[in-house]
Amino acid sequence: MRAWLLLLAVLATFQTIVRVASTEDISQRFIAAIAPVAAHIPLASASGSGSGRSGSRSVGASTSTALAKAFNPFSEPASFSDSDKSHRSKTNKKPSKSDANRQFNEVHKPRTDQLENSKNKSKQLVNKPNHNKMAVKEQRSHHKKSHHHRSHQPKQASASTESHQSSSIESIFVEEPTLVLDREVASINVPANAKAIIAEQGPSTYSKEALIKDKLKPDPSTLVEIEKSLLSLFNMKRPPKIDRSKIIIPEPMKKLYAEIMGHELDSVNIPKPGLLTKSANTVRSFTHKDSKIDDRFPHHHRFRLHFDVKSIPADEKLKAAELQLTRDALSQQVVASRSSANRTRYQVLVYDITRVGVRGQREPSYLLLDTKTVRLNSTDTVSLDVQPAVDRWLASPQRNYGLLVEVRTVRSLKPAPHHHVRLRRSADEAHERWQHKQPLLFTYTDDGRHKARSIRDVSGGEGGGKGGRNKRQPRRPTRRKNHDDTCRRHSLYVDFSDVGWDDWIVAPLGYDAYYCHGKCPFPLADHFNSTNHAVVQTLVNNMNPGKVPKACCVPTQLDSVAMLYLNDQSTVVLKNYQEMTVVGCGCR
């Protein structure tokens, strides 16, 4: 009886390790471990009291040793069989996953059969304790010698059987670590916030993208609602249907996007030196539309450029417009031949074509918009202000005749003899190379959706004006308690690929919007960024909870997010959207 109680105690000790194997494997290991001991328990109890106690102790100790080894699948076996030794002697390197599976099938199958034989043998020994030698021979004809030896020497047989079973069980259940890892990975249940958890953790054994794509795909109804909300936010009726592979994103747009994202802006305004873009929040780039009229300008120093700006919404206000031309530095030999400073400088002039000419009847009318001086030995872009022309085009789209650009010498105003300022594509120039150097028109508009004040002023716009606690300077230092349930900012990543928008949104592929959540406990500390009204509300709630609710955890500071995308007309658009991401949270 004590031996069985000891067995139960050992099983409880190794309950954690048993989780690695299945229930069927546990039953087989348990029967194989206790079979030889259970067969000889009556023999130990039938002897004297002293011998019975010592026998019980020895049986319990041997049983504990056998079970401890049998139920520890991660321990190295004390002894190996001949097949194990021959297999380990053939190779010194760590077996691969396929080798481990093959070794498992070769070694474990016959030993599993051996366990079944031990199971049947133990049942018969327990049911027939007073067996004779002839009955044993008839029932165990294929094991006559081994069983005959055990029946004459029970103690020696018990010890040898225990050692043999312990070695066999150890060899069978020492699994390859990769097999255990694969089984654990397959049983992973990814939580809803797995993306935020993975982002906060370090490098993982598994692929972050694979886990997220396989386990966190929203259902179709959720995707439809997300798409509707984002379209309303972006002021669109439907997502654009375009071929991204045929569109080249201009380098100036990429640089402007990097400039906006790399600086802390106080509002949604897009800064542009030299232009009145203080209240602009949208930038669009346009390329020249080829037509038959281009054949009338065969020279490189004089060319007509036409830009279709119909994609600009009528409710947006134009704040600025500029024409950017690319300059290619000439060789040192050409620059050296022009020893005079006047010969190494050229003038670029841009005109608005206000009226087209009629051959033999009238000449076209031009309006000079801007002029710039450039040098031959510099490679850069030249920007020209063309806002009056674009304003006229938006008011009367049918009178958009384009721009006329000329390159002349500074002194004599004669045509420039070199291809310094790139106005048109050369005959032998590749199309891909020209796309990075072609003239571009940039328009800066305001859609009127952003507020007049800075979006960072949200923190001071509620509950108390000048008396707001967040305005108090200087603050006394406070010791923050790291409580997860108090008001704070949490991660919330928005991935545009979830709604299939990664084909027309160039950058970013997603952004962290964050959200505010948590309790506002009494009393409110300074780091909760609360107003005087929130302090009074929390005080009244503490005295009479049923009268007023607690203060709420809400965003106190918001920031804008710049997006670079393509519209239905394949126009590259850079837009700053206000109040897109949470900067700070507080109790209000």
UniProtKB/Swiss-Prot annotation:
The keyword Disulfide bond applies. It comes from the Eukaryota. Changing V59G: In strain: dp cn bw. Expressed in the dorsal region of the embryo, and becomes enriched in a dorsal midline stripe just prior to gastrulation. Expressed in midgut mesoderm and in two overlapping regions of the embryonic large intestine. Expressed in a long-range concentration gradient in the wing imaginal disk. SUPFAM superfamilies: Cystine-knot cytokines (SSF57501). Residues 1-23 form the signal peptide. One of its GO terms (cellular component) is cell leading edge. Changing K121M: In strain: dp cn bw. Residues 24-456 form a propeptide. Residues 96-119 have a biased composition (Basic and acidic residues). CDD domains: TGF_beta_DPP. It is found in: Secreted. Residues 140-153, 468-481 have a biased composition (Basic residues). Belongs to the TGF-beta family. Heterodimers of scw/dpp are the active subunit, dpp/dpp homodimers elicit a basal response and scw/scw homodimers alone are ineffective in specifying a dorsal pattern. Component of a complex composed of dpp, sog and tsg. Interacts with nord and gbb; the interaction interferes with dpp secretion. This is Protein decapentaplegic. It comes from Drosophila melanogaster (Fruit fly). The gene is dpp.
